[in-house]
UniProtKB/Swiss-Prot annotation:
Localisation: Cell inner membrane
Name of the protein in question: UPF0208 membrane protein YfbV
Record field: transmembrane: 46-65, 69-91
Classification lineage: Bacteria, Pseudomonadati, Pseudomonadota, Gammaproteobacteria, Enterobacterales
Topological domains, Cytoplasmic: 1-45, 92-151
Domain of life: Bacteria
InterPro entries attached to this UniProt entry: UPF0208 (IPR007334)
UniProt-listed NCBIfam families: PRK01816.1 (NF002493)
Mode of membrane association: Multi-pass membrane protein
Family stated for the protein in its record: Belongs to the UPF0208 family.
Topology Periplasmic: residue spans: 66-68
GO CC, alphabetical: plasma membrane
Keywords assigned by UniProt, alphabetized: Cell inner membrane, Cell membrane, Membrane, Transmembrane, Transmembrane helix
Amino acid sequence: MSTPDNRSVNFFSLFRRGQHYSKTWPLEKRLAPVFVENRVIKMTRYAIRFMPPIAVFTLCWQIALGGLLGPAVATALFALSLPMQGLWWLGKRSVTPLPPAILNWFYEVRGKLQESGQVLAPVEGKPDYQALADTLKRAFKQLDKTFLDDL
């Protein structure tokens, strides 16, 4: 996945974008076969919740049993890096331009929203996955579920 050339995205802003993308993406079961985001978001949320305590427990357990400090720290750092890897991936995905097949579907969903009377801001440049997430979230709130039939 490559980021668009017209946007400068630094390493740390990807985490912020990933957090925003995970909150924006609609976790609908009908989207799961097409988009991997549902699984990645669920696992990232799980990792954010449970990996820090697991890292602390692992560190304390290995030190209490007289284990070496090096492997204990390495294991704890690996456990702490898992949520960051998920957020980084989501951030990269959010700024990735849509492929042609999904791009056509994106414009169809936007057209259905506009036909239903919704006012949408014009799309600037090539739409990315964040724009798709915003559009899908709005479509799930405003439209009936039949807009997914041609997915």
